[in-house]
Amino acid sequence: RHGNLFTGFSTEDTPAIVEATKFRQGIVIAQVNEIVDELPRVDIPGDWVDYVIQSPKPFYIEPLFTRDPALITDAQVLKGMMAIKGIYGEYGIKSLNHGIGFDTAAIELLLPTYGEELGLKGKICTNFILNPHPSMIPAIESGWVESIHCFGGELGMDEYVAARSDIFFVGPDGSMRSNRAFSQTAGHYAIDMFIGGTLQIDPYGNSSTATANRVAGFGGAPNMGCDPKGRRHSSEAWLKCGEEYGVKEAMWGPVHRGKRLVVQLAETFREKLAPGFVEELDAFALAKNANL
C-alpha cells in the first residue's frame, strides 16, 4: 500500500528500466496483480513509482523455455553428442550460456547420460548463465551443476528453484530474484562459451535467425555470442580458444590472451529442404527492405 513493488521470481530487468525512467524525469505506472499491506521483499521502492493499478486478473505469462523431450529429433541428439564430446569436453567448458531451442535442450538432457559415460562430470557445465530450463533438472539432480544465475523465471519452475537454493540465487523470502541486467553482464564478460541454434550461416561464418519468411527472436545471443576484450578472469577454456585464433599475432602481438568460444548449431537443410548454409543471409535483404 506504500507503492513498493514485489516482482518476485520473474523480476528480470524491471528494476533497471524503472530506475532509468524515474531518474530521467519519466513517469512509472505499475500494473499489479494484488495490493497488500506487507511484501515478502521489496524489488522496486515505492518512491520510484508514480501510479499503481490493480489488474482485474493476473497478467498472462507464457512458458518460453520448456521443451517437450519427445519432440527432440535424432539429428538434434546427434548434434548434442558431437558438441559434448568435440567441444565441451575438448575445451573443458565450465561457464556458459545455452540458447533456448531443442538443440541445447538435447545437450542438457544428455549431460547425466552421455556426458557421464565420457567421464566429464565436474569437468564441464558447472556454472551457467541461464533461465531455469526444466531440461536442466536431471543434470542438477545428478550433481553436475554448481550454480545458475537467471535472466528471468519460467512458468512452473518457481517451486523447484526455491527448493534448490544451493544452485539458484534465492533470497531470504524463499524465492528467486532473477536479474537480466546482471545476467547479461556476466554473460558478456565472464562465460567461456555461448552455444545455440541458428537458421542461416554464410561462407564467412555470419549467422542469423532472420529469414525471408521468419524473423525469430534472438534474445541475448548477440551479447553472449560476441568476444568481449575486457575479461577480468582467465580460464583454461578461454585461453585455449585464444591460442587457436588464427590472427592472434597480428591482432594482439605477444600478449597472451583468450577468446570467447561461440558455437552455432545448424542442419544442412531445414524444414521443406530450405538450406541452412547460404551464399548470402536473408537478413541483408530484410534490412534493406526495412530501410535499416
Model regions: which residues?
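Conserved phosphate- and dinucleotide-binding cores of soluble alpha/beta proteins
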Residues: 1-98, 102-126, 130, 134-292
